[in-house]
Amino acid sequence: MVDSKLTIADRSFNSRLIMGTGGAGNLAVLEEALIASGTELTTVAIRRVDAEGGTGLLDLLNRLGITPLPNTAGCRGAAEAVLTAQLAREALNTNWIKLEVIADERTLLPDAVELVRAAEQLVDDGFVVLPYTNDDPVLARRLEDAGCAAVMPLGSPIGTGLGITNPHNIEMIVAGAGVPVVLDAGIGTASDAALAMELGCDAVLLATAVTRAGDPAAMAAAMSAAVTAGYLARRAGRIPKRFWAQASSPPR
C-alpha cells in the first residue's frame, strides 16, 4: 500500500489537512473543529498570540497533541516578516515558519519581491520555511530554489471561498515542484479541497471555510474526508477525458 503520510522537511504527518485558527468564534468551537478535522499541524498567527497572551490557544493545541505552525500573518515587508519569525522561534521553540508577506490589506495577496527576499534570509538563518505564495509557477520555483521546504500557492484570495480559480497553474506548480505543494487559501467547501488533491497537491491548508461555516465541526470532518478522497483519487488515476461517449460494456 502506498504510504499516505505527508512529509515536509524532516517531519511526517498522518493527516494531509493543515488547519488555521483564524475566525473561530471561541476556543470551544475551535477545539471541536480541530478534533473533527484530524489535523496534526495548525497555524498560529504569532502577532495575535503576542497581543492576546496566546496561552489559551497554545494550551489547546498542546492538549490535543497538535503541532503549532507559527506564521507571519499581517507582515508587509521582508524585514517585518523576518523579525516576526525570529520572535516566533524564541517564543514557541520551533524553527518552522509559515511565511506570509502581504502586499495590501484589500487583496491580501503575497508581495512576490518581499516574499522571496524574506524566504532567502530565513533559510539562511536556519528556518524551515513554508511560504504562502501566488499561483505562479515561476515564483514557486524561485522559492524552492531559495531553499523553502514546501510551496503554498493560493487557490484564490484569503477568505473569499472562491475555490481554485486557476487549476491549470496549480497543476503546473505541482509538475515543476521538487518539494511538497500545499494549497493555501480560498477553499470554500469540501469539493474545493478534493480538487486540490486531485490536481496533485500534497496537502491543503484552510481556516475560514471551517471556522466560519454554519457547523464548523461538521465542515471540518467534511474537509478531512475530501482531502483523503482527493488524494486517493489522484493515486488511483482518473480516466482520460473524451470528447465522444464510450460505452462501458462492449457491444455483443
Curated annotation (Swiss-Prot):
<keyword id="KW-0808">Transferase</keyword>
<comment type="pathway">
    <text>Cofactor biosynthesis; thiamine diphosphate biosynthesis.</text>
</comment>
<protein>
    <recommendedName>
        <fullName>Thiazole synthase</fullName>
        <ecNumber>2.8.1.10</ecNumber>
    </recommendedName>
</protein>
<feature type="active site" description="Schiff-base intermediate with DXP">
    <location>
        <position position="98"/>
    </location>
</feature>
<comment type="similarity">
    <text>Belongs to the ThiG family.</text>
</comment>
<dbReference type="InterPro" id="IPR008867">
    <property type="entry name" value="ThiG"/>
</dbReference>
<dbReference type="InterPro" id="IPR013785">
    <property type="entry name" value="Aldolase_TIM"/>
</dbReference>
<keyword id="KW-0963">Cytoplasm</keyword>
<keyword id="KW-0704">Schiff base</keyword>
<comment type="subunit">
    <text>Homotetramer. Forms heterodimers with either ThiH or ThiS.</text>
</comment>
<keyword id="KW-0784">Thiamine biosynthesis</keyword>
<dbReference type="InterPro" id="IPR033983">
    <property type="entry name" value="Thiazole_synthase_ThiG"/>
</dbReference>
<feature type="binding site">
    <location>
        <begin position="185"/>
        <end position="186"/>
    </location>
    <ligand>
        <name>1-deoxy-D-xylulose 5-phosphate</name>
    </ligand>
</feature>
<dbReference type="GO" id="GO:1990107">
    <property type="term" value="F:thiazole synthase activity"/>
</dbReference>
<comment type="function">
    <text>Catalyzes the rearrangement of 1-deoxy-D-xylulose 5-phosphate (DXP) to produce the thiazole phosphate moiety of thiamine. Sulfur is provided by the thiocarboxylate moiety of the carrier protein ThiS. In vitro, sulfur can be provided by H(2)S.</text>
</comment>
<dbReference type="Pfam" id="PF05690">
    <property type="entry name" value="ThiG"/>
</dbReference>
<feature type="binding site">
    <location>
        <begin position="207"/>
        <end position="208"/>
    </location>
    <ligand>
        <name>1-deoxy-D-xylulose 5-phosphate</name>
    </ligand>
</feature>
<dbReference type="GO" id="GO:0009229">
    <property type="term" value="P:thiamine diphosphate biosynthetic process"/>
</dbReference>
<dbReference type="GO" id="GO:0005737">
    <property type="term" value="C:cytoplasm"/>
</dbReference>
<feature type="binding site">
    <location>
        <position position="159"/>
    </location>
    <ligand>
        <name>1-deoxy-D-xylulose 5-phosphate</name>
    </ligand>
</feature>
